[in-house]
Amino acid sequence: MIQFVLMDIEGTTTSVSFVFDVLFPYFRDNIQSIASRAEEPEIAAILKQVQDLALTETGTSLDQTGAIATLHQWSVEDRKVAPLKAMQGFLWEEGYKNGDFRGHVYPDVLPKLKEWQKEGIQLGIYSSGSVKAQKLLFGYSDYGDLTGYFDYFFDLKVGQKRDVQSYQAIAQAVQLPPEAILFLSDVPAELDAAIQAGYQAWQLVRPGTTASPTHQQVTDFGAITSLH
């Protein structure tokens, strides 16, 4: 019996276009604004992480301007690195709170969250976006604050989403056997890693998603039948 449903965000609970057409451009349009605030502790810590990672990866020593430019470039490349995700979360928080945008959630998601919560099934998010960014998206969603439906939020601190060890670590964190966990994602490689860890895993085939012939599929949350 499934006791925990773990969900991806982009392409699963949320439209890919919201991320690529709203969130990413907002970040790139506003990244230069942090130059005048580089002494703020949170910003300074993230820039230091950028400098450390650049030094490790390329041997390049970056000044503040170079670190900001690198964040912009990483965003263009959609790099899955922690400093970028942290800075995105920082700037997106301001956008959400200013009402510049609201977090997109597919209309079929909330009814299922309510149903699962009522049945006593625990719910969690696992995304490459930082936990902060995850909570902002669901906290300022089209349907209001949905964060109360989720028991856990996981990001890249637990590991990369295509690594089996990441899903093993999540199972340990929620203190459940892997076979009691259902993972929902649109990405076959992520589903494969979860399955190798012992999870059940289904592919969400949203508009624009290529269906995988090797995975169980649903087109929306409403198509997910009883988990008992």
Curated annotation (Swiss-Prot):
Gene Ontology terms describing biological process: L-methionine salvage from methylthioadenosine
Entry-linked CDD domains: HAD_EP
Keyword annotations from UniProtKB, A to Z: Amino-acid biosynthesis, Hydrolase, Magnesium, Metal-binding, Methionine biosynthesis
Entry-linked InterPro entries: Enolase-ppase_E1 (IPR023943), HAD-like_sf (IPR036412), HAD-SF_hydro_IA (IPR006439), HAD_sf (IPR023214)
Keyword Magnesium listed: yes
GO MF annotations in UniProt: 2,3-diketo-5-methylthiopentyl-1-phosphate enolase activity; 2-hydroxy-3-keto-5-methylthiopentenyl-1-phosphate phosphatase activity; acireductone synthase activity; magnesium ion binding
Leading EC class: hydrolase
Family: Belongs to the HAD-like hydrolase superfamily. MasA/MtnC family.
PANTHER family, per the entry: ENOLASE-PHOSPHATASE E1 (PTHR20371:SF1)
Subunit comment: Monomer.
Protein name: Enolase-phosphatase E1
Organism of derivation: Picosynechococcus sp. (strain ATCC 27264 / PCC 7002 / PR-6) (Agmenellum quadruplicatum)
Gene designation: mtnC
